Amino acid sequence: MAEYSKLYITNNGQALMAKMIAGSGNIDFTKVCSSSTQYTESQLQALTALSNIKQTTLVSKVTRTNEVAIKIDAAYSNVDLKEGYYMRTLGLYAVDPDKGEILYAVCIEKSNNCYMPPYNGVTVSAAYLQLYTTVGNADNVSLAVSPGAYATVGDIQALEKEIADLKAFVGYSDGDIYGVEVDFENKKFTRLAGAVNRSAGSGFDGINAFGGRKRCNLTNDGRVAAYYGEAGFSTTGKLTQAVDRNPVGTESPDENLKFSAGTIVQVMVEQPKFYYKVVPLKTEKRTKGAITRKIRYYVSDTPKAGFKLHPAFIVNGQENDVAYLAAFEGSLWDASASAYILDDSQVADFAADMLCSIANAKPLSGLTQNATRGNIRKLAEKRGTGWEQGVVQTASASQMLMLIEYATFNMQSVIGNGAVSKTDDGKTSMTENTGATITLGNASGSVVNANGIQIVSYRGEENFWGNIWWWIDGINHYANATTGECETYVADHGFADDIKAAPYEDTGMTAKYGNGYISAFCYSEDFDWLFLPGEFNGNTALPVGDYCWNQNGTGWRVAVLGAGWNGGLGAGAFYWGLANASSARSRFVGGRLVYRKKVAA
């Protein structure tokens, strides 16, 4: 990276500044020249010209930064450059009313790493410069620049943002952007851009954010041992055969790609990263933030102007290419017995045991054991660095993809009601065992167990709704029964209950206190990815079709998602429970695993 000295005003530059202060005229900056000569800082003030000038560019922009200082923007390109050179010295030129064009100020490059290559007919290289200098009185500086000057990177970025904002409002037409417009008031959903004329399922299989989701076996240290459909793939929690992921014939095989039979693995869904944009066309203001009336959601596999990387792929500032979501509801690994608990025996040691994601297990619950959100967090984190229970960021990623793929919030109407139709017995955990959708593989859909209970899956995630609620981490919620508003705080690491201090951030919006069918979500620009219930005037079908519980007095609350075995038509991918204290445990609530690589807090 280039490292430049401060900008030294030459003797001629100081003389011009004195004339300006005396009222003899303005300063008109004209050009910036780059030289391959290596001067010393002690030489700069006396210079009247530069030797070995290799390139000259016009000044692109002059900006007053305060009463006595300005910023000069300029840019170089190598399009006309026949020979490469090191940019060792930069000179700023101005017009003196008596002497003509003078060398006003000079700086030198100190690292000797700033090389401008010649143009090879293929790759264009460029340098963007910002020079700051004093002028005595910034009001006496000409801000006009030559129309032949380069547009700077800053200008281009600003223009790109304006164009992106305009396109977002008018509507994207790009084939590799996929979106949906939701008109909450008129209960209408419209496919946008590349999603137009696509059908859910096969119509989205070729899009990496959707079709790139695939079940896999993940080791405790975050290595993929096998993918669904491969010979070594297992749903039992252990590899049943040795796996070597090195290409056949590799001369120097990577030992990290070799896995022995018996290796502990979890069944996860690999979710490729994607970028998103939310465009609020109509919102209704609240005390904090707003609620949605008409809004557009877009995703893309690749970065686009105005799009952001979805927070599911960001942990404490570190960006990840993938996230791993539990294929199945969490069960228990009993460390003392070195065995998976398959019947929800209430034997959890929250200091030693681990949360799991395997097939043919009855999901862990808080029937009698103290399976609070905080304790399920311990079970998840015990598996190793990067492991957590389900977090709001990854839950939101799946919610956003479902919404865009199906052009509805009501997943029960397009995938299936799920395991939500049982009559509760008032005393037991009535969950179905995990793994009923093994045969669906990476596809969405539903199967029916022998007892008539339907099990659903969204692209590898079984029972995202129904069967048992699951704790959602990374979101803390302070309910105010008096004002009817609930402040919400979110973090992507360093999880704890009942706090709003760092790393938690105020979302700038308040969830609706009370119970009912969701008719609008909350909105704030910084947390536009979050589907937080903001109004309860809906029904079992539209505009969302899912219920929300958020009424349990004033105080800190934690979140659950999805519904249990008796959730009925109120259940779904957007069915939130926001009424539990952090001390709560329930036979209706369990947990799910998530794996995201992360840096230390």
PLM feature segments, named:
Residues 258, 262-265, 302-464:
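Short aromatic-cysteine micro-motif
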